[in-house]
Amino acid sequence: MKKQVVEVLVEGGKATPGPPLGPAIGPLGLNVKQVVDKINEATKEFAGMQVPVKIIVDPVTKQFEIEVGVPPTSQLIKKELGLEKGSGEPKHNIVGNLTMEQVIKIAKMKRSQMLALTLKAAAKEVIGTALSMGVTVEGKDPRIVQREIDEGVYDELFEKAEKE
């Protein structure tokens, strides 16, 4: 028998045995508490955000695995800055400022879904999203910070982050 996949959207770190999870996995004969605990462990870093989760179940052995999707980069930036939404006019209206540490943190979360081969490249993708949202980085225009990354200005931060 082939594996069954259940896809749900849960709040990071706060999944409960109630809907939508319980009714979706209960009929498969799984220990719902075990599944909920595993999902909460896997999604705790996305607290306060809706996170897509796939539960892959082998109906014969009752074994399951959890695949956690990552919220969009813009959601992660908004969470990091405590924003409701990005700027409607990013060229004229700046709504927040990210530190390089925050950029690296978001890049590490999103890296598995990005095409970027290095953490630096992933950080530059995050900075590109910040630009379109009206968010500065280190108090500067995001395009300037991208050039500084290429010039090696933040190399120490990246080396430290790669080791963590």
From Swiss-Prot:
Any Pfam family hit: Ribosomal_L11
UniProt KW keywords: Ribonucleoprotein, Ribosomal protein, RNA-binding, rRNA-binding
InterPro entries registered for this protein in UniProt: Ribosomal_uL11, Ribosomal_uL11_C, Ribosomal_uL11_C_sf, Ribosomal_uL11_CS, Ribosomal_uL11_N, Ribosomal_uL11_N_sf
Record carries keyword Repressor: no
GO MF entries: large ribosomal subunit rRNA binding; structural constituent of ribosome
Domain of life per record: Archaea
Gene Ontology BP term (one): translation
GO CC terms, sorted: large ribosomal subunit
Subunit structure: Part of the ribosomal stalk of the 50S ribosomal subunit. Interacts with L10 and the large rRNA to form the base of the stalk. L10 forms an elongated spine to which L12 dimers bind in a sequential fashion forming a multimeric L10(L12)X complex.
Record function comment: Forms part of the ribosomal stalk which helps the ribosome interact with GTP-bound translation factors.
Family: Belongs to the universal ribosomal protein uL11 family.
Protein name per UniProt: Large ribosomal subunit protein uL11
Organism of origin: Pyrococcus horikoshii (strain ATCC 700860 / DSM 12428 / JCM 9974 / NBRC 100139 / OT-3)
Source taxonomy: Archaea, Methanobacteriati, Methanobacteriota, Thermococci, Thermococcales
